[in-house]
């Protein structure tokens, strides 16, 4: 055991003398490693008489534990000293201004959708949504769109198969909402729609908001009043609005809505009309009792008019120089 005490004393001295973590690890290996001095002591127990092995093993394990504790304590002290030296070497100028956190901003299309939702929400319109992959019934048939209508061709619509396609408008949401409820209805349906078109004023994917009100004694004058108020609210000024006769399969009568620009020219902004009786019949609503109006608008077009953007494609090119203007 005298030799064991000598090993402990030497180990303690080496641990205290270690001035770095690297040197301390070398001391650990010297005494506790696979070929370390204390490990060798444990391996030599087999040479002792059986009656001495137990006591000797206890003494060696006790010594091993003491060395491990001493190494852990020295390691902690060295790490603290290293951190203190690092902090002392680093200087912080507390007079420097802080780093400015740059806030993000909503996309202009998102801003427009939120403005539309807020206006109609204040009039009691709910916001509904539906699938972007639509079937022929909800996208065409229930909306009184005939089999030979141009919208049913590959030229205008992205088909998966003859009965499944990317929706060309959010009107399918109107059908689904009426299928799942009973009149009266008052809601808008914003969302992405898809058409096979790409140029300065068209993209294959764009955003649309359609609205519908179905109740007893609904008339065109109510539709005109709501849309006039909406456009004045959206452009934040009193705008001159006109309604032109038009044609949509799902409304009768139908109209295009224009606003007069600052240059005196009329600009088309949305379409509308009274819900066609066939559309009401397709969802089990009696057109003799109920009537309704519907309207639809392209979000990007309204956004272009509001912010003076000339190219629709700019909204989807993710150019921060463009998008930062709307923060």
Swiss-Prot record:
Cofactor descriptive note: Binds 2 magnesium ions per tetramer.
PROSITE patterns (alphabetical): AA_TRNA_LIGASE_II
GO molecular function: ATP binding; magnesium ion binding; phenylalanine-tRNA ligase activity; tRNA binding
Any GO BP annotation: phenylalanyl-tRNA aminoacylation
Superkingdom of the source species: Bacteria
Pfam family for this entry, one: Phe_tRNA-synt_N
Catalysed reactions, as listed in the record: tRNA(Phe) + L-phenylalanine + ATP = L-phenylalanyl-tRNA(Phe) + AMP + diphosphate + H(+)
Protein known as: Phenylalanine--tRNA ligase alpha subunit
Species in which this protein is naturally found: Vibrio campbellii (strain ATCC BAA-1116)
């Amino acid at each position: 055991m005298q030799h064991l005490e000598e090993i402990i004393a030497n180990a303690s001295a080496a641990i205290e003398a270690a001035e770095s973590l690297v040197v301390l690890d070398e001391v650990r290996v010297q005494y506790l490693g696979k070929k370390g001095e204390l490990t060798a002591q444990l391996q030599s127990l087999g040479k002792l008489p059986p009656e001495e092995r137990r006591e000797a093993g206890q003494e060696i394990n006790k010594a091993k534990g003491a060395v491990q504790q001493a190494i852990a304590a020295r390691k902690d002290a060295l790490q603290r000293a290293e951190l203190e030296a690092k902090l002392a070497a680093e200087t912080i100028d507390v007079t420097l201004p802080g780093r400015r956190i740059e806030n993000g901003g909503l996309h202009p299309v998102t801003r427009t959708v939120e403005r539309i939702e807020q206006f109609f929400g204040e009039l009691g319109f709910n916001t509904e949504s539906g699938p972007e992959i639509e079937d022929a019934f909800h996208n065409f048939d229930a909306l009184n769109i005939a089999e030979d209508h141009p919208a049913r061709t590959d030229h205008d619509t992205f088909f998966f198969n003859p009965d499944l396609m990317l929706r060309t408008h959010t009107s399918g949401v109107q059908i689904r909402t009426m299928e799942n409820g009973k009149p009266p209805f008052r809601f808008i349906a914003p969302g992405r729609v898809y058409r096979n078109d790409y140029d300065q004023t068209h993209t294959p994917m764009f955003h649309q908001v359609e609205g519908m009100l179905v109740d007893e004694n609904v008339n065109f004058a109510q539709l005109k009043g709501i849309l006039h108020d909406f456009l004045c609210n959206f452009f934040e000024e009193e705008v001159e609005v006109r309604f032109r006769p038009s044609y949509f399969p799902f409304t009768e009568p139908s109209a295009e809505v224009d606003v007069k620009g600052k240059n005196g020219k009329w600009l088309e902004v949305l379409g509308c009309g009274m819900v066609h009786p066939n559309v009401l019949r397709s969802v089990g609503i009696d057109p003799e009792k109920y009537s309704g109006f519907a309207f639809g608008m392209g979000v990007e077009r309204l956004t272009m008019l509001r912010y003076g953007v000339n190219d629709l494609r700019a909204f989807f090119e993710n150019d921060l120089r463009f998008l930062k203007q709307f923060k």
